[in-house]
Amino acid sequence: MSEQTQTCASEIQATNVAVQHPKSEKINLMNLTRKEMRELFAEMGEKPFRADQLMKWIYHFGEDNFDNMSNINKVLREKLKQIAEIKAPEVSVEQRSSDGTIKWAMQVGDQQIETVYIPEDDRATLCVSSQVGCALACKFCSTAQQGFNRNLTVSEIIGQVWRASKIIGNFGITGVRPITNVVMMGMGEPLLNLNNVIPAMEIMLDDFAYGLSKRRVTLSTAGVVPALDIMREKIDVALAISLHAPNDELRDEIMPINKKYNIKMLMDSVHKYLEVSNANHGKVTIEYVLLDHVNDGTEHAHQLAEVLKNTPCKINLIPWNPFPEAPYGKSSNSRVDRFQKTLMEYGFTVIVRKTRGDDIDAACGQLAGDVIDRTKRTMEKRKFGKGIAVQNH
């Protein structure tokens, strides 16, 4: 293992230790992969297939009550009730857009995270968070303004999928498209929480859980290169790179992670990932948020084309979602069109991501941040004897 990879691994481990969530006396079964659940059942003197049955109840049927698991005998159900629980994050606030997008603030301990459901004509995508806040401090990101609090556990990651599935109809309620895709593009940097993100994605892929194709699970990263190299050896899912700048000088300014792992280092790691991945069809997705007169000029498009000339990719151009006190502006339609056309002249596949949820808090992290701020204000008022209740939605 390289010195750089060792450093990254130690950073991840240190972060996990520093922010451990208080443990329940009972085992939360949502923290376990099928292999780990089988090991638990073996310790209980039970056959491995019982673990398979239990996973089906939890993830196929959305069941969190052992008493309702009819093909598991009563003695085993009673054993499970003594030592285990099935616990997912609860929704504290829900916002529904006129275009069908649903955004939830979910409670994890005493903190808030965000999960977003995005229905389309041929699919429904769930955008999942991996951390409470984020340590990377990208200047254009609402979540980054909150700072980093802690990593999410496996159950808090996969539990977002479970909770959303229960709400929008994966478990037999009609009228809403079931979740077909999951993207790790919510709050946080997934590669700084590998210990929990990888098992959560394994559950997403497991046929006894959600059985998603590895092409339908996407991890988006700002470029923690050593962690990407580790992930390459552990799991194969679709990969998206949050690039957002065509040169190191600009990327250093808007994405401080680039000072540690620059564009060349990142793209070298991406090429290694593509060499072994079946999930990506030989192409990586490049994400590029457009900031008015910062990174959206024709010269930037030419520079980006040069950076990506040897990388099989599709490029997603993302209209920036403003948030309070942000230092940037949203690119005009004409600048977006010109940027897209310039890249297409080089032969790239370039898609301008359709803006969703315009009538709700669209910027990632904004809803959770608003809930946290409102709760803090409420607690401060209570502290000084004003006793105002938290606003219900």
Curated annotation (Swiss-Prot):
It comes from the Bacteria. HAMAP family: RNA_methyltr_RlmN (MF_01849). PANTHER family: 23S RRNA METHYLTRANSFERASE (PTHR30544), RADICAL SAM CORE DOMAIN-CONTAINING PROTEIN (PTHR30544:SF5). The gene is rlmN. Pfam families: Radical_SAM, RlmN_N. Keywords: 4Fe-4S, Cytoplasm, Disulfide bond, Iron, Iron-sulfur, Metal-binding, Methyltransferase, rRNA processing, S-adenosyl-L-methionine, Transferase, tRNA processing. It catalyses: adenosine(2503) in 23S rRNA + 2 reduced [2Fe-2S]-[ferredoxin] + 2 S-adenosyl-L-methionine = 2-methyladenosine(2503) in 23S rRNA + 5'-deoxyadenosine + L-methionine + 2 oxidized [2Fe-2S]-[ferredoxin] + S-adenosyl-L-homocysteine; adenosine(37) in tRNA + 2 reduced [2Fe-2S]-[ferredoxin] + 2 S-adenosyl-L-methionine = 2-methyladenosine(37) in tRNA + 5'-deoxyadenosine + L-methionine + 2 oxidized [2Fe-2S]-[ferredoxin] + S-adenosyl-L-homocysteine. [4Fe-4S] cluster binds at residues 134, 138, 141. GO terms for biological process: rRNA base methylation; tRNA methylation. Binds 1 [4Fe-4S] cluster. The cluster is coordinated with 3 cysteines and an exchangeable S-adenosyl-L-methionine. Its EC number is 2.1.1.192. It is found in: Cytoplasm. Specifically methylates position 2 of adenine 2503 in 23S rRNA and position 2 of adenine 37 in tRNAs. m2A2503 modification seems to play a crucial role in the proofreading step occurring at the peptidyl transferase center and thus would serve to optimize ribosomal fidelity. Its cofactor is [4Fe-4S] cluster. This is Dual-specificity RNA methyltransferase RlmN. The active site is at 114 (proton acceptor), 364 (s-methylcysteine intermediate). Disulfide bonds join 127-364. Its main location: cytoplasm. Reaction proceeds by a ping-pong mechanism involving intermediate methylation of a conserved cysteine residue. One of its GO terms (molecular function) is metal ion binding. Belongs to the radical SAM superfamily. RlmN family. S-adenosyl-L-methionine binds at residues 188-189, 220, 242-244, 321. Residues 120-359 form the Radical SAM core domain.
